From Swiss-Prot:
Gene3D superfamilies per the UniProt record, alphabetical: P-loop containing nucleotide triphosphate hydrolases
Heme is among the record's keywords: no
Organism per entry: Geobacillus kaustophilus (strain HTA426)
EC number: 7.-.-.-
Family assignment from sequence similarity: Belongs to the ABC transporter superfamily. Energy-coupling factor EcfA family.
Name of the top EC class for this enzyme: translocase
CDD domains for this protein: ABC_cobalt_CbiO_domain1 (cd03225)
Protein name, entry field: Energy-coupling factor transporter ATP-binding protein EcfA1
Record key words, sorted: ATP-binding, Cell membrane, Membrane, Nucleotide-binding, Translocase, Transport
Length: 279
């Protein structure tokens, strides 16, 4: 069996002058090409994990291995070249006057030759379907477009893993769907490993596997269908089940023969329409 691309082994961390651990004895793995979502309410420890993965925070106990190597001072810069982090606020990520300049910035810092740089920029912008906006100023873009440009900047560096740290939380529904569709396509077509840090279970439903965090510890782990069966347990820790999951459950209670496993409104409507058409 292939070695996991990410392995977190008994990791604990607490912030300075804090008695309670932000993350305590957390262990999990991620396979190459997997979309793994870490979900939890604010303060559950999920964003602390994201910062440890790129070396911004150092575990007090335990070990983090990425790409088969222990994450430490000697390996952190290599890891950062292979992992891209998309933050919550897209406006905090732009440094260039145009979309093209912004994508070029990280390439220049990594010493990529000019001709190769141009090729990578064109390829990355095509992958996120933003070709018409290459010479736009970032402030003229919508929130979803800005996050797609941020993803393009990461893709130009050709990473093995993308971390989305609440990357859709400030977007409207259309922008959120644009970003998630882009990520799903890259995950499926290029086998880029995706680690999604979110409190939004509708976003997490798109992942292959979920890890639920509560008070710094792993509360549950499984597929979206397995996790959503927890129902009220998730709601008690401040997580809101997707509308389609709640509505599907209520309809089944009323005797409507719906199958389980619907996570989006579109899927639920399609199933209801199919049932109606059979009458």
């Amino acid at each position: 069996m292939a070695e996991p691309i990410l392995s977190i082994e008994g990791v604990s961390f607490r912030y300075p002058n804090q008695s309670d651990y932000a993350v305590q004895n957390v262990s999990f793995t991620a396979e190459r090409g997997e979309w793994l979502a870490i979900v939890g309410h604010n303060g559950s420890g999920k964003s602390t994990i994201a910062r440890m993965l790129i070396g911004l925070l150092r575990p007090e106990r335990g070990a983090i291995r990425l790409f088969g190597r222990l994450l430490n001072d000697a390996t952190v810069w290599e890891v950062r070249r292979r992992v891209g982090l998309v933050f919550q606020n897209p406006d905090n990520q732009f440094v260039g006057a145009t979309v093209e300049d912004d994508i070029a910035f990280a390439l220049e810092n990594n010493g990529i030759p000019r001709l190769e740089m141009v090729e990578r920029i064109r390829e990355a912008i095509r992958q996120v379907h933003m070709e018409p906006f290459l010479h736009y100023e970032p402030h003229r873009l919508s929130g979803g477009q800005k996050q797609r440009v941020a993803i393009a900047g990461i893709l130009a560096l050709r990473p093995d893993m993308i971390i989305l740290d609440e990357a859709t939380s400030m977007l409207d529904p259309r922008g959120r769907e644009e970003v998630l569709e882009t990520v799903r396509r890259l995950n499926r077509q290029q086998r880029i490993t995706v680690l999604s840090i979110t409190h939004d279970l509708e976003e997490a439903a798109k992942a292959d596997r979920l890890i639920v965090m509560n008070k710094g510890e792993v509360m549950a782990e499984g597929t979206p269908e397995q996790i959503f069966r927890l129902g009220s347990k998730l709601e008690r820790i401040g997580l809101d089940l997707p509308f389609a999951v709640k509505m599907g459950s209520r309809l089944r209670e009323q005797g409507i023969p719906l199958r389980a496993g619907y996570f989006t409104t579109e899927e639920l409507v399609e199933e209801l329409w199919t049932l109606y058409s059979k009458k």
